[in-house]
Amino acid sequence: MKVIFLVDVKGKGKKGEIKEVPTGYAQNFLIKKNLAREASSQAIGQLRGQQKAEEKAQAEILAEAKAVKKILDDEKTRVQFKEKVGPDGRTFGSITAKKISEELQKQFKVKVDKRHIVLDHPIRAIGLIEVPVKLHKEVIAEIKLNIAEA
């Protein structure tokens, strides 16, 4: 019996995959537990439509990420921070991914999720710093931060 897997089933198939499995296994386990459904021509057509829509959505997300990367990679795009600095040359407060995201939104009207900003630890130094941003699994940009003394 041919079935379309609705979820990943270890050792049998991945979501969206069409596979031939024993009839008893399909009827008594996969279909009963909503892990798969019978691969009729209508169900296969519906699956193809869903896959096309998903591909289109992924292409749009990728295009949007590339557009944001182009803005961030521009030399004029420098996020300005003015922080109080102690005698040792380190800032009193640290600059976190959340702060960077908020300032980017304020200064350049570019929305970047704070979880996409890759910071090993909060920034406490002054000067020009480049921070990587993972906009998409294929697109990585760099934000230039200019941290000055207030």
From Swiss-Prot:
InterPro entries: Ribosomal_bL9 (IPR000244), Ribosomal_bL9/RNase_H1_N (IPR009027), Ribosomal_bL9_bac/chp (IPR020594), Ribosomal_bL9_C (IPR020069), Ribosomal_bL9_C_sf (IPR036791), Ribosomal_bL9_N (IPR020070), Ribosomal_bL9_N_sf (IPR036935). Keywords: Ribonucleoprotein, Ribosomal protein, RNA-binding, rRNA-binding. It comes from the Bacteria. Coiled coil: none annotated. It holds the Pfam family Ribosomal_L9_N. HAMAP family: Ribosomal_bL9 (MF_00503). This is Large ribosomal subunit protein bL9. It comes from Streptococcus equi subsp. zooepidemicus (strain MGCS10565). The lineage of its organism: Bacteria, Bacillati, Bacillota, Bacilli, Lactobacillales.
